[in-house]
Structure formats: C-alpha cells, structure tokens
C-alpha cells in the first residue's frame, strides 16, 4: 500500500486527499508511529489554499477553474505564513508546477508542515493528492525535497494502480 510505504519511509502521517466544494477532504490516512504525531480525521475538510495537498491540486487545475476557485473562496490568514492573496497563491502554484510537489510551512496550523504531490489522470487533470504531514521540528525545510521525492514516488505507485 503506497500510503503505508510512504509513512514508513518518512516516519510521518500520510493522507489521501480529494478536492470537493472548494475544500480538501481527507479520504484515507496512515498515522505515524511516532509518539508525537499529526493526524486529521477521515472526512475532515480544510481550505485548499492553506495546505500542501490543496495547493498541489490547485496547481494543476485548468486556468479557468483556478480563477473560478479564487472568485468563490475568501482567502484569510490562519497563521502569519498563510498565502492570503490571489497573486501570492498563483506565484506559489507556479513553483509547485515547476518542482512537482507542494509544501505547507505552517500555513494552516502553527507548528505543522506538509509536503504533497498530485495524482493526475490521463488528461492531466488533478484527481487527488497524497500528502505527508508532521510536526515542523521533524519536517524542517531541509527535508522537503527528500519527502517531496518520496511523495512523487508514491504518486507513481498509486497512479499505476488506479489508472492502469
């Protein structure tokens, strides 16, 4: 199972996320074995713009759908690092497209970092995202590339299972 393998590889909680009604919905998760861990509840909804899985999905939406999202969502700050303007979010989404994965530096909750990659269908449309979430002290920026690459590997594994 790709989520379990990713959790074991990174040591952190992993989740499978979809976008619904302009929010991210946790479909499934594998909770970390660490004594201090981060997890959400399956079925929990969070704003897309303030979390890595949401940004990974938004980055690959067609431009018209992204603009529609921005027209319908009020961007507000949850922490000092939340991207709360359309221009700052669009700039970050370009970076996500360029590197292949999204990051969340405590943008939704203080002390929580996430790294995520999107699963695209055969038409390059975002289906869902896989994310690794953990406390900032164990997921510092220095680990983002390593974790991002692990997420991309898990995406390839999941995509092969669900789309082949």
What are the language-model segments listed below?
Residues 30-32, 132:
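Residue-level structural signal for beta-strand termini and adjacent loop
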Residues 36-108:
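Short, solvent-exposed recognition segments
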Residues 15-17, 56-58, 113, 129-131:
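Residues embedded in well-ordered beta-strands
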Residues 15-17, 47, 102-104, 129, ...:
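Structural detector of well-ordered beta-strand residues that form the stable sheet scaffold
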Residues 21-24, 32-35, 63-64:
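Short, charged/polar surface micro-motifs in flexible loops or helix N-caps
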Residues 85-154:
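Extended hydrophobic
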Residues 1-29, 146, 153-154, 158-164:
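Intrinsically disordered, low-complexity terminal regulatory regions
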């Amino acid at each position: 199972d790709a989520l379990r393998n990713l959790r074991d590889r990174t040591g952190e909680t992993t989740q499978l996320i979809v976008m619904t009604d302009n929010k991210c919905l946790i479909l499934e998760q594998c909770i970390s074995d660490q004594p201090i861990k981060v997890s959400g509840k399956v079925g929990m909804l969070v704003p897309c713009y303030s979390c890595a899985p949401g940004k990974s999905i938004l980055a690959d939406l067609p431009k018209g759908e992204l603009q529609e999202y921005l027209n319908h969502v009020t961007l507000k700050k949850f922490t000092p690092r939340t991207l709360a303007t359309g221009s700052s979010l669009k700039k970050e989404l370009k970076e996500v497209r360029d590197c292949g994965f999204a990051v969340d530096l405590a943008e939704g909750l203080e002390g929580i970092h996430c790294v995520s990659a999107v699963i695209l269908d055969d038409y390059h449309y975002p289906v869902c995202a896989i994310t690794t979430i953990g406390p900032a002290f164990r997921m510092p920026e220095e680990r983002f590339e390593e974790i991002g690459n692990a997420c991309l590997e898990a995406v390839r594994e999941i995509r092969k299972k669900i789309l082949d």
